[in-house]
């Protein structure tokens, strides 16, 4: 492998572009806030600002990557097929969504404000890439907890997509469901392309994707979800032989080609996402910040641990190699909600001050990585090394 390829892999694996974008945004917004906000919200082409381009167009491809992972997991041989083998992590996922939402709403009722209540969806998110990275450091690459956590994060993202679509329409523009017929038309186009055995992904993206995007946009549902409805129609193998983040050299399907050719664009494009969404002034920290942080680190950990434990009690055991200690640490790792949590913060609140406060709570959730590492040491978690290394 060339030095250039190794460098690119390192940057992708450790989410360096996203982290770099977040750091630049934080420094810029606190040193020159007016200049930063002008850069982000100033119209660059017609009425399109950089913020709109990143959140409403670029993020279409980010959520498409998540949809690919979900699609692969549902194939025979994938981690969600057959469903029975995934019951324990699926129940843990349910706890990881309900736990933080309930903690957020409960704490908000005690110490918060009614205007904060819309933020309940923010702490339900788990960052797939960061969770995978930290899990490999804490457990080792081949530990069962890594696959458990990946499955949890993927389904969590799927639920997150539904939360964004159904609970966070633009309050200034009520949902106009009739326009969703365009999205249905986009799905029909993708289905017909699949029936005609069209192998290039471009017709699916250009014809089906644009129709889907237009339908969501005109219906006032976030258009970043457009390709989520198209990806499952891309031709793919009849079964999933390799795990997530693993390349099958024999897989030249349309689904795999689309992922392979766009993933590097998405991974490095997250620098722009971090730059345009994480520019929060520290002066905006308030009670909402701590509600998001506590709901993420506390609510998600407790929810995952309780529901994963309940699944074991009622007859759906942990994956081989996992126990209660590993479940607890996995719950802490899942509390990192950076990417999707930042995104939901932007659609949950109109007030820039509330957006900033919520985003700061999402950023602070990175502390979960430190907690997970320390907890793993205290509990004596044994790392499972990569046998292929």
UniProtKB/Swiss-Prot annotation:
It comes from Desulfitobacterium hafniense (strain Y51). Belongs to the NhaA Na(+)/H(+) (TC 2.A.33) antiporter family. InterPro entries: Na/H_antiporter_dom_sf (IPR023171), NhaA (IPR004670). The lineage of its organism: Bacteria, Bacillati, Bacillota, Clostridia, Eubacteriales. Signal peptide: none annotated. The chain crosses the membrane at residues 8-28, 48-68, 91-111, 119-139, 173-193, 214-234, 262-282, 288-308, 327-347, 361-381. The keyword Ion transport applies. This is Na(+)/H(+) antiporter NhaA. Keywords: Antiport, Cell membrane, Ion transport, Membrane, Sodium, Sodium transport, Transmembrane, Transmembrane helix, Transport. GO terms for cellular component: plasma membrane. It is a multi-pass membrane protein. It holds the Pfam family Na_H_antiport_1. Na(+)/H(+) antiporter that extrudes sodium in exchange for external protons. GO terms for molecular function: sodium:proton antiporter activity.
